[in-house]
């Protein structure tokens, strides 16, 4: 059985590798997504990656998913982390758990995520390897459930 995970790349992720490289690193969004796909393949997981700078588009995308096809979701809310959007409520209403991932540690910069309370867990501070860490943890937690 194929295990599917949806990955949401939030606002300003398309600026990765261009802006604030000292915080977020030199990898572009395309490079980050390629790494996610490589890590997923190594775990025998299928990923669907979606990016938008518009919170309403993210909500519309999530509401349009066939929720029976996914075991989990991963979100790097990026610019949506501290914004008041419908994303947290939409995530909370999903039939599968979501996990928040950040390559850096937002708390180190005093950032408090408005998305995290709707998530089952989080992975912060491992660079873009955090997506693979999250996918591995999702699979392990399903084995022990």
Question: Predicted regions span which residues?
Answer:
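Short, acidic/small-residue loops that bind anionic groups at enzyme active sites
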Residues: 91-109
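Glycine- and acidic-residue-enriched helix-capping/strand-helix junction motifs
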Residues: 15-31
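Extreme N-terminal starter segment of soluble prokaryotic enzymes
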Residues: 1-5
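Short acidic/histidine-rich motifs immediately flanking catalytic phosphotransfer sites
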Residues: 65-73
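Hydrophobic/aromatic beta-strand patches that form the interior of the parallel beta-sheet core
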Residues: 6, 50, 74, 99-101, ...
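Short beta->alpha junction loops
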Residues: 48-57
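Short, glycine-/small-residue-rich phosphate/pyrophosphate-handling segment
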Residues: 107-145
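Short glycine-rich anion-binding loops that position phosphate/pyrophosphate groups of nucleotides
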Residues: 11-13, 78-81, 104-106
